[in-house]
Amino acid sequence: MQAISLRKAINTLHLWLGFISGIILLVVAITGGILAFEDEIRNLTEHDLLYVEAQQKPKESVQHLLEAVREYNPKAMVTQVRYFGDPEKAAQVYTKDKKIYAVNPYTDQVLGVRDQEKNFMFLVLSLHRTLFLGHVGEEIIFWNACVFLVILLSGLFLWWPRRRKQFRQAVTIKKNASVKRRYFDLHSVAGFYVFIPMMFVVVTGIDMAAGGSSAPKKKSNVTEGIAFAASNYDSALHQSYHGEPVESIRITIPKDSNDVIGVSIRYETSSLRKQTAFVYDRYSVRPLSSDKWQDKTFRQRFFGSDYEIHTGRILGLPGKLVMFLAALITASLPVTGFLIWNGKRRKKRTGLKSGSPA
């Protein structure tokens, strides 16, 4: 009797949380499915801004890339510069007005500009992360992800077969079944198959939406009396990078006179992210701190790889495909859940009408 009451309570919780989060879950799942293949879509639609012809010479300095962008647009306020380990990839220069300048790293030529407020993939990403509602949207997405975690766990409880003999039926969509049964199978069985990938998605999603972990902010020492030079960016880069195979290198530009130079190096890996970050005084280029991937615990590296796990790219193309299919199936769950509920509601109404006095 207690087991039945518990099951009924969890079923009610599952139902109402589904009502609360269903529409948002639908939007987030569809956009998430698209973002699983973000790189492939960009390579097709933005190839000329992402790739250049590799040359047998060193890449240009950070200082020269900054000068090229400021010559192209004197009003550009640069926030970061990004190089890639792939010799055929263009460098990227980010600015405060949410634009990304594609620059040939061998010639300093500006190839073009992407506006993050108009670019299709950036709009999909913004919808996925904020629902186009800014900080309020970020909060909604965070709490919706927490709700979805409860939905997943309660759904697994409701799916779990009471007897071993029922297991095969619980993992199979019955053929030639009634419409009502088909809706139930599409919801219950499909939900079971996406449970594991969606657990990874929701746990990493919650961590990303919460902002992850951040180290205390360092400051540059303005009182040293040393004038700042643009070449300091390259000095910081040379102290940090010594020719190892990398996926990308990001140099963060100070926001003001007290801010620091940041250098973040993401090394090549086929597993959890290997990323080391260095912080330098912008005037003396004196090292202020470092956060090396070798010193991180498994948990730190796991959550440091949030994005790779969240999108499936940690397992390459197969991982992306799994997350894409899981996202599409997840998008269907609020729909099939509503159809199941609506079918029961209609049945109750029909029963009440047939049982009413003439």
For each feature predicted by the language model, list its residue ranges.
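Conserved histidines in hydrophobic membrane contexts and catalytic metal-binding motifs
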Residues: M1-A358
